[in-house]
Amino acid sequence: MGKEQELLEAARTGNVGLVEKLLSGKKGLLGSGSGSIPLPGLLSMWRGLNVNCVDGSGYTPLHHASLNGHRDVVLKLLQFEASTNVSDSKGCFPLHLAAWRGDVDIVQILIHHGPSHSRVNEQNLEKETALHCAAQYGHSEVVRVLLQELTDPSMRNSRGETPLDLAALYGRLQVVRMLLTAHPNLMSCNTRKHTPLHLAARNGHYATVQVLLEADMDVNTQTEKGSALHEAALFGKMDVVQLLLDSGIDANIRDCQGRTALDILREHPSQKSQQIASLIHDYMMSDCDRGNFHEDLARHRPIPTPRTSIPSPVPSPSLRHKNDAVTGELSKLLNEIKICRDKDCSFEELCQTISSHSQSMESFGSGRLSDEERNGTLTRINKRPTPPLPPALEEEEKSCGPSGLWEALTPCNGCRNLGFSQDKRCVEIAHSPSLDVFLPEDEDNPYESVATAVTRKPCSLDINLHNACPRNGHFSHVSVSDAERGNHGDDSTGLTPDCSPPSPDTALRNIERVIRPQPKQRTSLSSSQDVQKPLQNHSGDPSEVSSSLGYASFSTSPPASPPISPANCSTGSAEDYALTDEATYQKECIERDDRRNSHVPEQFAGLLHGSSPACESPDNPYQLYGKVRKFSVPEPPLRHGNFLRAPEYSPPFPRTGSEASALKTQREVKPQVVYRTIFHTRVNQGPVTFGEQVDKTTGVHARNGEARSNCTGGSSPANSNTGYEERACTLGRMRSMPKNVLDLQLSRNFSKSDSNLVAVSPIEEEQWGSRGQSSPGKSSPSRLERTPSFTAEWEEIDKIMSSIGAGIGTEMEGITEDHPGPRCPVQSVGQWLDNIGLVQYENHLLSNGFDNVQFMGSNVVEDQDLLEIGILNSAHRQRLLQAIRLLPRVRPIGYDGNNPTSVAEWLESLELGDYTKSFLINGYTSMELVKKIWEIELINVLKINLIGHRKRILASLGDRLHEDPPQKPPRAISLREPTGNHTPPQLSPSLSQAYPNAGSLDVQHLIMQADARRRRNDNYFEDVPRSKLERQMAQVSMQGEWCEPITLRPPNEATSSTPVQYWQHHPEKLIFQSCDYEAYYLGSMLVKELRGTESTHDACAKMRSTEQMKKIPTIVLSVSYKGVKFIDATNKNIIAEHEIRNISCAAQDPEDLSTFAYITKDLKSSHHYCHVFTAFDVNLAYEIILTLGQAFEVAYQLALQARKSGHGSSTLPESFDSKPSKPVPKPRGNIRKSMEQPSMDQKGHANVPWIVEPGQEAKRGANTKAMADAHVYYSGIQRM
């Protein structure tokens, strides 16, 4: 057997020469050229080595050579007839080992050479083929060769795994791709235990999961463990979870135990679990929103469905014919307007030209759609019948006076086409499927907007500005509210228009914008995904069509009951709704509450909305300002999508007596119809992705100035009858404002907005409007001039607008100072989140102290705070921050009259009165002390654990000029030396001992004591310490005389065995208080021979070996300069106390750095015991050891100081007395519990000032070797 062992070793090491020498007596089959074998040769073969000999593991020389990659040895062995089909003790063949190694050459040799060829589908004892071995370890070339040799990739091992399963499990991306390419059917060969997707998701192989999903593997494939989401969530693979969610996985799939992925995460609470649960929760909420989007809105508040959700209707041939006819008629009109412009025709001639064409176009509009065509196009879209328009509305609209192209010709600052339809076509068009709700040119009648616009007189409009800026750009919204919607249809039918006539150039440009919208604007329209919530008429169906960049907007709200009485509008009504893409689930109950709060009947809510959007051109930005005066009636603030706006009021515009009389006559003879027009125009829109837009539509909000005029005693005669008053507005007179002034105005608006959302207050509108007229009852002469010379008039208007624009910037700055920011209504955090569509984060905010919207301004809540409390979605955080910027900022102390005189008053102003007792108990008894507080004191001293409350307190304190925070080494504290009592004062007792009835603590008594201390020392606040410990030192310093300061040696000088240069705590912490640590107490061991750290190491090793055999208690180690107290962690009872003088050594266990021990001496028996503890982590054990060393150093320096002062041993601290104050624990954890409280009449020399060497605090966890060496010897204290 010796030679066989040599052969096996030679094959293992690759010694080809030795292999050939050992096998030379055996004639190779492949090398034989002779036909017959002589007898000596046969005898030699009989006596020769067996080439297939095996060792103890069943390996043949070919196994060894294949496993170790010796190609030449493999060839030599095969030449000497080595068999490739001999298995080892585990059933593995040489091919398995070569595939496991990934040696392609040897795999090919084993398959194609030798007397016997390897069988590629051979399985070992675990049912694994060579393909399993190669796939598991990612040997893609071996996999390719085996696949070419027709290896079966569907074979499973004993665990039911295919090669694809193993490749996915271990993230072998290239192998996965090869297997999927060669055998796509492998994805369907799954078991109930696992799939490749589950295995890849479990181990977090992001790329592998992505490849499997790209290969059309079903993302919702289930096993007994649930979906792949279950696996990824359970094993904390956040990126894979996100990938699966992005792929549309069903998060509601349950495993065999009926648990969803969220249920599993709740069973494993950890930070990673919370983060993954937040991702899944956000996904489920958004998925629910997408799934129920149209259904919920159709059920609760019918609005038009998005354009992309349905196919565009195909116009019928009759419609095309009508469209062509209208196109021809409009072309003629444009040509004649050009001729009028070239000839400089008068305004009257231009009106005649327009009127003649408007009548012909009106005929096309009246017969635009037959009933059958309507059913085939618009009605087919929403499948809801259109309610018939009330006869009163039809009659009113047919008697609306002379027609004219005012809406198209009036230079209304970008409003392309304003007006009304003449019949119920207006209501029917509201069912258009587009988001901006008007059909494009290839649907129905593209020119209806012009046909209806030329048949109506212009409406008196009130215009105000409000801006909304999405993240992807800025645009300005100008609200245009119909001032006559409350007049019940009493339009003035005089021929004189309310606004000055435009020039032919302006009229031509406006008409061209209507009928020839820019292609770029069409793209912007189709790409926007705004969701506009229309108001409802009395029948509950929407009757609004908003427009965008060239498309018309109509809205009618026929009345269903008598006009609103003045009593019902005592406080006004203001609602401003705009739905963002993720806020579609706002509750109807909130809407009803808002209506109830505004004292407006619900059925009339739609009549009080008059939204007006930004009428602004993308190429020439400018603004409109209405003539608005602030009203005296209070009004609730408005909700506007993602932000809150200040209330706006529209007071009545007085008219002359003749106008009022004419209006009164009309009211007596005409039926009263209330209607409104809503114009929506968007500016500078870009493509917006779902979930990233911020309120791109201007919501509807009620102006209702006419109704309020009667409530407050309007002066017009018309008020006495109906309570409604008409107003006039020179719509469009701002068009010629110099562009430089307008650009300056816009730049100021946007540059001063932290939140990119600008809300203009009514005061600004009042001031802007008042500059355009000398008095409320008079208009300047230029307003009423009607001259044929348009150039002269517009030049005069330019001068007026220039004078107005010159002071806009300064006015806005002044107003901004008076009104620092929009105020928010009194509402809960849940309501506020509901308004911005992120109600799912209510618990996140409330549980972390962000529980009051009045104290959640931008100086309190930051992006990092939102991230820390678990809001991981960056888009949601940005939306929250944008809404937070509109909340009121917390006013710092001393700002704007905010000067609280006491701590209690200050905390009550922050609605944090519950912390008053904690502040006073810990010495913060005045605002002077509070102003110097740091966040670390809020956490460690005051125990304010809620980050929202801490941020609220710090924001209230404002930007303070402080020294370095207290966590750094403090400055040298020079305490005064008042004369008087030479006896050192007592140490400050613990709070529970000093105030036994802390639950009913007299707060006023504490304040009186603090005041008395201040009266005893007039210089109390000259050098007020920053921390509670320093304040206690200041209190002690007023009662005794001190010796010279002392200096603590750094750790590396106090003992040579540690390289640490800085202590862990400030010395006063160990004198006036204690450092408390929780740890597991493993027990104690009798130390027969004191050998320093070797004794602690032995005890740690022994305790570790037995810690599994008993119940390990949790204790609190309270370390001070006196020693270490054992405190039961459950009931907080003091079990025992080890004096500092009796502790001789403390060290960490070199084998387990989280285990540490220290040796104490029992004075009664004079025996030493080693007490062993296990900390929760290595860093904590390191800190405890270092704190013990610092406690010894403080006690040592205090003892030296006492000896130098001449007090002798009688004045040494209590820890150096001869008798122990507490029993010492017995060996092996037999600890006696004692309820005896420590004596409070102890004498000590803790009342000594000191100077700490400047430097940084010790750094933890940096070097485990340093930690192991961070033990401290406590010797010499007994020799003093």
Curated annotation (Swiss-Prot):
Stretches with biased composition (Polar residues): 520-550, 707-723, 770-782, 980-994
Stored CDD domains: PTB_Anks, SAM_AIDA1AB-like_repeat1, SAM_AIDA1AB-like_repeat2
SUPFAM superfamilies with a match to the protein in the record: Ankyrin repeat, PH domain-like, SAM/Pointed domain
Stretches assigned to the PID domain: 1071-1223
One GO term of the biological process aspect: ephrin receptor signaling pathway
Region feature (Disordered): 299-322, 361-399, 479-573, 704-723, 755-791, 960-994, 1208-1243
Protein name from the UniProt record: Ankyrin repeat and sterile alpha motif domain-containing protein 1B
Biological source species: Danio rerio (Zebrafish)
Gene giving rise to this polypeptide: anks1b
